[in-house]
Regions:
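Short pre-catalytic strand/loop immediately N-terminal to key active-site residues, enriched for Gly-Thr
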Residues: 64-78
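Short clusters of hydrophobic/aromatic residues that line enzyme substrate/ligand-binding pockets
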Residues: 20, 67, 126
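Charged C-terminal helix
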Residues: 99-138
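Glycine-rich beta-alpha junction loops
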Residues: 11, 46-48, 70-73, 106-109
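Phosphate-handling active-site elements
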Residues: 63-65, 91-104
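Short, small-residue alpha-helix embedded
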Residues: 14, 74-98
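Conserved phosphate/ATP/ADP-binding segment of small-molecule kinases
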Residues: 1-64
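Active-site-adjacent loop and "lid" segments of alpha/beta metabolic enzymes
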Residues: 48, 78, 132
Length: 138
């Protein structure tokens, strides 16, 4: 099926059939979601309140891995979930391990969010082309 699922908190709540309010809930939800057939579950913590946003990677039988990121005060967040999963996929295609792929994808996404432009109505898009040369790996 899929190697990695990347639900945000509301999506994870639906997939797991439970409310998520803390890290223990995230672990229980990730375990339930992994039973759908995915080796890895990355629950994105962007919907939690606070200055720091933490994503949690679950792999059955291993300790949960946390990926920290700053909360950016912007409305230009349209496409962040798709951008993150696509970036992870691109790094995996370059034969990086899952942890490295996620860390690099989060770095890329942070830059794309910071470079996003206002469109005056609703949530604007992230800027996928903010600094592509810096991301090239030789």
């Amino acid at each position: 099926l899929a190697t990695l699922l990347t639900p945000n908190i509301p999506e994870a709540e639906i997939l797991a059939g439970m409310k998520i309010q803390n890290k223990e809930d995230i672990q229980n939800a990730a375990l339930a979601i992994s039973k759908l057939g995915s080796k890895y579950v990355l629950i994105k913590g962007g919907h939690f309140q606070g200055a720091e946003k933490i994503d949690y990677l679950f792999e059955d039988g291993k300790p949960i891995t946390s990926y920290r990121g700053l909360s950016v005060n912007t409305r230009n967040t349209h496409g962040t979930g798709c951008t993150l999963s696509s970036a992870i996929t691109s790094y995996l295609a370059r034969e990086m391990d899952m942890n490295t792929a996620i860390a690099m994808a989060k770095t890329y996404l942070s830059g794309a969010i910071l470079a996003g432009k206002d469109v005056q109505i609703g949530n604007g898009p992230v800027n996928h082309f903010y600094e592509p040369k810096a991301l090239f790996i030789k």
